[in-house]
Structure formats: C-alpha cells, structure tokens
Amino acid sequence: MADLDWLIARPVAHRGLHDQKSVIENTPSAFAAAIAARYGIECDLQISADGEAMVYHDDALGRLTEGCSRLDATTAAELKRAAFKATGDSMITLGELCDLVAGRTTLLIEMKSRFAGDRRLGSRVAAVLSGYHGPAAVMSFDSAQIADLRAIAPGLPRGMVMEKQGWDAFAAAPRRAMMTFAQALSARSQFIAYAVRDLPALLPTIARGVFRLPLLGWTVRSTDDRRKAARYADQMIFEGFRP
C-alpha cells in the first residue's frame, strides 16, 4: 500500500477555495486562494470533444458560464472561450492546473463520468500527470475508471468516491459480505472519499479500520459535518468556511 499520509495532511478545499460570489468554483482564482491559505485542492474533470481533460464540474455549460452545450460535444478551445457569468476567469485544462499549482499543495482530482464506457478521460489524466512532480491523487464514482487507471498508471494514487445512495443493498449485508466487498475495493483503490452525511457506515469503517485505506469525508459544510469528519474520517473535503 502506498504511503498516502500527504493526502490527509491538511484540509482539502472542495473545488478550490471559493465563495460563490467573486471567486467561483473550479477556477484559477479559487485554486490560487486555496494555495495561499495552505489547503489542499479538490477539483473536477470533464472530457472535451477532442479528448482534453477540462477542469469543470457539470457535464454541460450553463450553471456558471454562458452557453448550454455538453462538454464532451465541445472542443477544449471552445470551452476555454466560454465566459464565466460572475468572474473574469476562464476554464482551464488539467495541464494548466498543474502548471498553476506547481507542487505547492495536494491535488485531489475527481474524474466525472456518464457511466457510458468512455475511457478517454482516464487516459488523458494519466498522460498529463505522468509529467507532474507534485502530490496528486485521482478519484471517481465510476469503479471502471479506477480499474482502468490502475492498469494504465499503476503508480498513480487512486480512490473511490462513494455515498450511501446506490449502495442500500450493501447497507443491509452481513459483516462477512461487507468485509469481502471492502477487500475487493482495497485491491483497486488506495483511499476512499465518502459522503460525510452518511457517516458512520459499515463499508468505510471496514475499509479504514481493517484495510487501512485513508478516508476523506465530503462535503463538510457545517459544525456537525466537521464533528463527524473528525470522528469517522482521516480528513475533510470542505466548502463554505475556513477550518
């Protein structure tokens, strides 16, 4: 098991350190603010039509930017020209994010997925991070993406993003069955990011306690969330305040 103490050494700013006003999520300004405050950075990636890893959460434009097209139907050059509604920032690529961070803090990168078998994003992430020398880890809700990443970039730290929703069948499973599942999970993943609202839960408890997988709680937004993360996880992914 890789030593991932660096991954849980400091609180991680969810989509950068943003305020939903002058500093918008997943923008260079939010990432610069997180670096200045000495937090880790969590960000989201979507694939563009031409196979570039773009730093953006939604699978389509519109919520934060002008336009309404799907990211996977729009080229990287077009996406970089899409104006944010409330800031002068532009959308950036993973490579540009790596240049901005330059190893000054932890990068926790979530690969978004439509669960449709498109594996281009993992390949692009592996290619970009192969030339990056700062601390970085990749995670996804899509277990197939993580399995692919293990195959093409076995040295790249990888983890699963999880929540109770969608796992209700496992919630009632006997402990032995949950132990078997957690063991299989640990074979693919080196850490888990679990919804703090669903903690404590049996699966992350076994993964953390038995298989020693680092556990991050997301997204911590309240005093109660923070208390739960401190008790049941190794670190928090936070938003809306400064820990």
What role is predicted for each listed range?
Residues M1-P243:
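Phosphate-group recognition and catalysis centered on beta-loop-alpha active-site segments
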